[in-house]
Amino acid sequence: MEEYQLYLELDRYRQQDFLYPLVFHEYIYGLAYSHDLNRSIFVENIGYDKKYSLLIVKRLITRMYRQNHLIISAKDSNKNRFLRYNKNFYSQIISEGFAIVVEILFSLQLSGSLEEAEIIKSYKNLRSIHSIFPFFEDKVTYLNYISDIRVPYPINLEILVQILRYWVKDAPLFHLLRLFLYDYCNWNSIIIPKKSIFLFSKNNPRFFFFLYNFYLCEFESIFFFLRTKSSHLRLKSFRVFFERIFFYAKKGHLVEVFLKDFFSTLTFFKDPFIHYVRYQGKSILASKNLPILMNKWKYFFIHLWQCYFDVWSQPRTIHINQLSEYSFHFLGYFLKVGLKHSVVRGQMLQNGFLIKILIKKLDIIVPIIPIIRLLAKSKFCNVLGNPLSKPSWADLSDFEIIARFLRICRNLSHYYNGSSKKKSLYRIKYILRLSCIKTLACKHKSSVRAFLKRLGSEELLEEFFTEEEEILSLIFPRTSSTLRRLHRNRIWYLDILFSNDNDIINHD
């Protein structure tokens, strides 16, 4: 990122609050399409001389502003295959370059804020999504109430553009942004159809994820700011803080804010035992205090979405549940708080007695049914969990077939080894093991029993169960009691950066 910043002379444009010229740099599109910085996507694909690449980008932007999006002239269309595509193709190309520009800008701002908050030193240790579960184990068992929140969408994109303008003072850049969004969405409607959002995210994945993450970041920045300053905001209207122009100016003078008659008012409160966790669009809010405080946070979220982002959200979509009676899904796991009975023997003088103790314990369980459905979708088994062969892999060598199945088992073990109960994980391994045997038998045109008999033993397939034990034995002492204890306990791997079920069972 520092190399790109130096190469694109980003500091000079940031000082002038003018990023629009960066869209005309051909190196931006080299980054967007994973090309080398010294080569141009336009030069490589079309055969243009290097000096014309800037002209092509300018032509594309000019054509986006015109009513006739198809062909500038017959002369141009005959010479340039590149100019015969439709307007969505032009928007897609330039939006990728636009996304690179804003990604670099906001990543630099994020790094600066982390350094100021002295978080940058521990940031690398918190990159793994599995670091959330040790946090749950330490905190959740002491809490009483939990709320499972879905961040509403789609957002009014015009509101999102207006919010972005308070971060970057560049009017031409946002005129271009509006033009991208206008190509995919009905700009005049308050609620953007989900079909348009799906089309936009499919054609412009980098740009879409930037806008979606910025929406979440803006929502959480207001939430965290008001959460930390809640003791100073008692009996104040929170509608006044939604005007972003005055929002940051009043951060140092919150006591001086006047009580005004706005559309909605919320009494702020102090809740030191509240915890908030989010991954993608799903959030978990947990608290130790009375449910009335959780109810206040619930209506705070609803008013925030409706008044600031113009996103409709109903109170019944957010449920407040008692943690001891509620279970929830998060990051592919099934979590619930259970009671563990423990008996302690005590003795006073000559009298002995037993003390029964109830201890809260967080159970993190592998959801066996969704994983079996995922395996059934990939044709490893049927919907009942009965293993099937993979005829499409029969043309591969035996070594490649076994390697693919082992890779899938390794991914599943790597991700779900933090489960409290390993029986479900072993069942999934068993399904994959039999699916591998059936695939090999199908390749050699024999039955499973005849194939195993001809093989003589199952040493070739023992890796399905011994590989994990060999890895653990390299880390911990080679004692049977230690390995048995490790198989019962949870093991979290802090090198998992994202969660995607399709990638877990992907053989590539």
Curated annotation (Swiss-Prot):
It is found in: Plastid, Chloroplast. GO terms for biological process: mRNA processing; RNA splicing; tRNA processing. The keyword Plastid applies. GO terms for molecular function: RNA binding. InterPro entries: Domain_X, Maturase_MatK, Maturase_MatK_N. Coiled coil: none annotated. Usually encoded in the trnK tRNA gene intron. Probably assists in splicing its own and other chloroplast group II introns. Belongs to the intron maturase 2 family. MatK subfamily. This is Maturase K. It comes from Acmispon americanus (American bird's-foot trefoil). The lineage of its organism: Eukaryota, Viridiplantae, Streptophyta, Embryophyta, Tracheophyta. The gene is matK.
